[in-house]
């Protein structure tokens, strides 16, 4: 299961080129050393290089611009331009994104990527566009299924009779 799906989003105005030309704000909630932090820093470096320095990226890490929900709101309002966000927060805007967290949904990462790079990803992007956002890509923290303290749960059938708590 993908317990956390990170979607990189930008307001449609940045894609259209009407946002501030000098600096793009990329906000996320991760701390230094986290893969999302490292990826955001690399994105900033490459984006600045690809634009010949005409545009720079200010990475606002460690939730300095708010939690995931607040960052999505800020992106729709044009306060920030890009956010690497969570499945839970994104599902408040595109409810279908919540389905991506179901246990055993994907048999492996290649299957998950095929789905997200296909019609499902296009549908998520279209719904995000309705809220003033543009999905640039997806982030994963690996596929996770259900874990239990007493026994393994390698298949859905292993859940039979088991009591579990969910958020």
Each PLM stretch: what is its role?
Residues 45, 86-167:
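Contiguous mixed-secondary-structure segments that line small-molecule binding/active-site clefts
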Residues 7-9, 19:
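Cleavable N-terminal signal peptides
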Residues 1-7:
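Bacterial N-terminal signal peptides that target proteins for export
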Residues 23, 45-63, 134, 156-163:
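A local structural motif
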Residues 52-55, 71-85, 163-165:
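Alpha-to-beta junction loops
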Residues 60-73, 152, 167:
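Short helix-initiation/N-cap motifs at beta->coil->alpha
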Residues 14-21:
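Sec/Tat signal peptide C-region and signal peptidase I cleavage site
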Residues 25-42, 62-67:
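Extracytoplasmic "Venus flytrap"
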């Amino acid at each position: 299961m993908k317990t956390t799906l990170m979607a990189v989003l930008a307001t449609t105005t940045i894609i259209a080129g009407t946002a501030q030309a000098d600096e793009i704000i990329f906000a996320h909630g991760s701390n230094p050393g986290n893969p999302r932090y490292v990826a955001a820093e690399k994105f900033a470096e490459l984006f600045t290089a690809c634009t010949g320095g005409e545009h720079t990226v200010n990475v606002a890490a460690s939730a300095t611009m708010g939690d995931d929900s607040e960052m999505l709101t800020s992106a729709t309002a044009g306060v920030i331009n890009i956010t690497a966000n969570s499945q839970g927060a994104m599902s408040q805007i595109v409810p279908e994104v919540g389905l991506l967290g179901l246990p055993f949904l994907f048999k492996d990462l290649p299957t998950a990527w095929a789905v997200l790079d296909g019609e499902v990803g296009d549908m998520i992007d279209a719904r995000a566009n309705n809220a003033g956002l543009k999905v640039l890509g997806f982030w994963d923290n690996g596929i996770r299924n259900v874990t239990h303290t007493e026994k393994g749960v390698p298949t859905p059938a292993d859940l039979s009779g088991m009591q579990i708590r969910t958020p």
